[in-house]
Amino acid sequence: MAEEPTYTTEQVDELIHAGLGTVDFFLSRPIDAQSSLGKGSIPPGVTAVLTSAAEAKSKPVAAGPVKPRRKKVISNTTPYTIADNIPPEKLPINTPIPNPLLPLARPHGKMTDIDIVTGNITEGSYKGVELAKLGKQTLLTRFTSNEPVSSAGSAQDPNFKRGGANRERARGNHRREWSIAWVGDQVKVFEWCNPRCAPVTASARKFTCTCGSCPSICGECEGDH
């Protein structure tokens, strides 16, 4: 059985001094990532043999050509277009805002107004008054679950829909149209005539005949102003 080696105090101090010198040497210089060895590259076993093999494997890599680093191209263009937060032009105090259903340049027709507070109704056609009453009832009950008392001029009434069947309108080859709007405390119903061949739009517009068989004035629109 071989005897264990013994070291004197001077030999131990010399080994410690050499080890500390090696540590100071590597700490005083930058570490090259290509030549440094991680723990994952040294499998368990005879450390001296495996370490030498790993170092020999890393030397060709260090001696190989160094790839140039790619320069990061910084684009000067903004990827997003930022909208200007310009405040809208403020209207003077008490400036009325036009209702889209009641344009300023509306065609000739009849206007029926009903005041919700007083219940006063301006002069208008029978159908306009009925629709104004329906508009008032709808406005007062729009946030409740109560059913309307009367269906006159309601969605169940075919005459309420623009272009609905009507014998008088069929004779005149005109289509009577209505536009209901709520302006303040008033319900406004505007009515006018359009040729039957004209398209149905959401705004109060006057169209001209395109089929050549519609008269310019019918029995319903001859009294419009």
Swiss-Prot record:
Nuclear localization signal as annotated region, ranges: 65-72
Residues holding Zn(2+) 1: H174, C193, C218, C221
Signal peptide segment: none
Organism this protein belongs to: Human parainfluenza 2 virus
Biased composition (Polar residues): 145-157
Pfam families on file: Soyouz_module, zf-Paramyx-P
Location of the protein in the cell: Host nucleus
Binding residues for Zn(2+) 2: C197, C209, C211, C214
Region (Disordered), start-end ranges: 145-173
MF (Gene Ontology): metal ion binding
Annotated keywords: Host nucleus, Host-virus interaction, Inhibition of host innate immune response by virus, Inhibition of host interferon signaling pathway by virus, Inhibition of host MDA5 by virus, Inhibition of host RLR pathway by virus, Inhibition of host STAT2 by virus, Interferon antiviral system evasion, Metal-binding, Viral immunoevasion, Zinc
GO CC, any one term: host cell nucleus
Any one GO biological process: symbiont-mediated suppression of host cytoplasmic pattern recognition receptor signaling pathway via inhibition of MDA-5 activity
Keyword Plastid found: no
Quaternary structure annotation from Swiss-Prot or TrEMBL: Interacts with host IFIH1/MDA5 and DHX58/LGP2. Forms with host DDB1, CUL4A, STAT1 and STAT2 the HPIV2 virus V-dependent complex (VDC); this complex targets host STAT2 to proteasomal degradation.
Family membership: Belongs to the paramyxoviruses V protein family.
Keyword presence, Zinc: yes
Protein name: Non-structural protein V
Job description of the protein: Plays an essential role in the inhibition of host immune response. Prevents the establishment of cellular antiviral state by blocking interferon-alpha/beta (IFN-alpha/beta) production and signaling pathway. Interacts with host IFIH1/MDA5 and DHX58/LGP2 to inhibit the transduction pathway involved in the activation of IFN-beta promoter, thus protecting the virus against cell antiviral state. Efficiently blocks type I IFN signaling following infection by targeting host STAT2 for proteasomal degradation. Also plays a role in viral growth by promoting host RhoA-induced F-actin formation.
InterPro entries membership: Paramyx_V_Zn-bd (IPR024279), Soyouz_module (IPR025909)
